[in-house]
């Protein structure tokens, strides 16, 4: 089933028993996080809070939380019925990432419908967009009227978490979609927390170089259809826009409308859009925001001190400086739904997303490394800091080649600290088997690869330097000649005929 907007998805989830409406007053300050966290850990439904209230303040917008709280709901959002079907999406992305020339006329004819479908999914623009039915400008913009979550007791301020940020570099036709958290620092300002390698930050870097001193346009979308949301967190090839990929997932072209104050396109059937800019400022400027947050000029633009916030690591992160997004205009539906989430100690909603998107990664890796049988990012490892890879080993040193390949092939794995490589007789998703392989097939000195001074997640306080740290690879495969001089162990295998007889006997024993 495919969904035109967030409301279509909500209705479908409710029909399936995958969404619960909460009519009692619940506060976006701490309470919604606690309720969603308990519900997620119980593998419960999405929650639609219909009466958000903090103290005497009642909010007009209902709040949607725990939307992608189970892998199945992620799959449904991507147009699939179950998580295993996401491998098909991964195969499509693998082909689009590195398309192979047709092997002949028949092969070209077989591939033509797929390429035509991709071309046919270019987004279309409409003028009268539901998301622009209500327009608030200038002094009318007040983020305090939105039920923005204050997720954890130690968080410095309310935080926009599911903002789909739309940017475009000065020399690019394609827009970039990214999801970056945004700290509220005044009625119309937030901090745009994006790391230097992310698409929005790269667009802003190019803008500063080519158009210094000019406001950088940004639009932030809150609450759009699931295909567009998930397209923004999927490793889409550079040749394909996220909007086009969302159309492929949905089975229909993404309907966009131009922002009223800039040339960025946003989903026409979204709930809320924040339009504005990153602000240039005078050299040497320093001050404080309306909410008392330190401000200063960096590279000609206004920045603010962000954090601390509870993060997906399960800890509060360090403070750092990021650019300030000034909101000139807020457009919305008359009865807009505010979509939010939280990040915390795994397993949280981003970790669940990681479990589902793991299935998308596997075919992409297999196209580059056909010897890979499975690839698993355990959610307990923050969904990206540890990977377990099983391979059909073919030569000495093969495991180390796969480690290096995984670290370098997709930018999504740049921050993976630990990679364990096992043989194809080991289930990567069964820790008992992985531990057995590590403890019986590994020598700690011979089979451990340590790499120093590599890019590391900025949030990883365990690294010796912010953004720079080590990586460890563990070769837990059976060793080949050249890797050991010793006779290698022969695994115990049950007699097949005896096992078959015992299978029959087992049914009669009542054990």
Curated annotation (Swiss-Prot):
Q: Where in the cell is it found?
A: Cell membrane
Cofactor(s) recorded in Swiss-Prot or TrEMBL: prenylated FMN; Mn(2+)
Gene3D superfamilies in UniProt: Single helix bin (1.20.5.570), UbiD C-terminal domain-like (3.40.1670.10)
The record's Gene Ontology biological-process terms are: ubiquinone biosynthetic process
Residues recorded as binding prenylated FMN, renumbered to this chain, are 179-181, 193-195, 198-199
List keywords of the entry alphabetically. Cell membrane, Decarboxylase, Flavoprotein, FMN, Lyase, Manganese, Membrane, Metal-binding, Ubiquinone biosynthesis
Please indicate if the UniProt record lists Cell membrane as a keyword: yes
Q: What is its EC number?
A: 4.1.1.98
Q: Where on the tree of life does the source sit, at the highest rank?
A: Bacteria
- The active site of this protein is located at 311 (proton donor)
Pathway assignment reads: Cofactor biosynthesis; ubiquinone biosynthesis
The note on the cofactor says: Binds 1 prenylated FMN per subunit.
A cellular-component GO term for this protein: cytosol
Question: What are the protein's GO molecular function terms?
Answer: 3-octaprenyl-4-hydroxybenzoate carboxy-lyase activity; metal ion binding
Does the record's keyword annotation contain Lyase? yes
Binding positions (Mn(2+)): 176, 242
Primary role: Catalyzes the decarboxylation of 3-octaprenyl-4-hydroxy benzoate to 2-octaprenylphenol, an intermediate step in ubiquinone biosynthesis.
Q: How does it assemble?
A: Homohexamer.
Identify this protein by name: 3-octaprenyl-4-hydroxybenzoate carboxy-lyase
Q: Which organism is it from?
A: Laribacter hongkongensis (strain HLHK9)
């Amino acid at each position: 089933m495919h969904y035109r907007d967030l409301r279509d998805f909500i209705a479908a989830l409710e029909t399936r028993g995958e969404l619960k409406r909460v009519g009692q007053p619940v506060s976006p300050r701490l309470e919604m996080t606690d309720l969603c966290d308990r519900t997620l850990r119980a593998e419960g439904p999405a929650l639609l809070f219909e009466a958000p209230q903090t103290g005497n303040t009642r909010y007009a917008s209902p709040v949607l939380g725990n939307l992608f709280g189970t892998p199945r709901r992620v799959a449904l959002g991507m147009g699939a019925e179950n998580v295993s079907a996401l491998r098909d999406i991964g195969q499509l992305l693998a082909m689009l990432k590195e398309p192979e020339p047709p092997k002949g006329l028949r092969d070209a004819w077989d591939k033509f419908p797929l390429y035509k479908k991709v071309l046919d999914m270019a987004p279309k623009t409409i003028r009268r967009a539901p998301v622009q039915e209500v327009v608030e400008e200038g002094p009318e913009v007040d983020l305090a009227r939105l039920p923005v979550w204050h997720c954890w007791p130690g968080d410095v301020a309310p935080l926009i978490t599911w903002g789909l940020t739309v940017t475009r570099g000065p020399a690019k036709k394609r827009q970039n979609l990214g999801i970056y958290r945004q700290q509220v620092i005044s009625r119309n300002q937030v901090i745009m927390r994006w790391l230097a390698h992310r698409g929005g930050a790269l667009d802003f870097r190019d803008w500063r170089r080519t158009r210094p001193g000019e406001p950088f346009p940004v639009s932030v979308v809150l609450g759009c259809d699931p295909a567009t949301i998930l397209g923004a967190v999927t490793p889409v090839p550079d040749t394909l826009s996220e909007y086009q990929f969302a159309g492929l997932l949905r089975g229909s072209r993404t309907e966009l409308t131009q922002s009223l104050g800039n040339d960025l396109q946003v989903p026409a059937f979204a709930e809320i859009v924040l339009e504005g800019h990153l602000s240039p400022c005078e050299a040497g400027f320093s001050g404080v925001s309306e909410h008392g947050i330190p401000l200063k000029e960096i590279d000609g633009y206004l920045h603010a001190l962000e954090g601390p916030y509870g993060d997906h690591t399960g800890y509060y992160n360090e403070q750092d400086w990021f650019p300030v997004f000034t909101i000139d205009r807020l457009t919305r539906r008359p009865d807009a739904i505010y979509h939010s989430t939280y990040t915390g100690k795994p397993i949280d909603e981003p970790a669940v997303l990681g479990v589902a998107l793991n299935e998308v990664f596997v075919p992409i890796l297999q196209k580059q490394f056909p010897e890979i049988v499975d690839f698993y990012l355990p959610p307990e490892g923050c969904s990206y800091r540890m990977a377990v890879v099983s391979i059909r080993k073919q030569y000495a040193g093969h495991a180390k080649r796969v480690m290096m390949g995984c670290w370098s092939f997709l930018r999504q794995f740049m921050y993976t600290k630990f990679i364990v490589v096992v043989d194809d007789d080991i289930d990567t998703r069964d820790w008992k088997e992985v531990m057995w392989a590590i403890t019986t097939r590994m020598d700690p000195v011979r089979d451990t690869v340590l790499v120093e001074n590599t890019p590391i997640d900025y949030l990883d306080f365990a690294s010796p330097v912010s953004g720079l740290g080590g990586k460890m690879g563990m070769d837990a495969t059976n060793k080949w000649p050249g890797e050991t001089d010793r006779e290698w162990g022969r695994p115990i295998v049950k007699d097949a005929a005896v096992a078959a007889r015992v299978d029959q006997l087992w049914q009669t024993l009542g054990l």
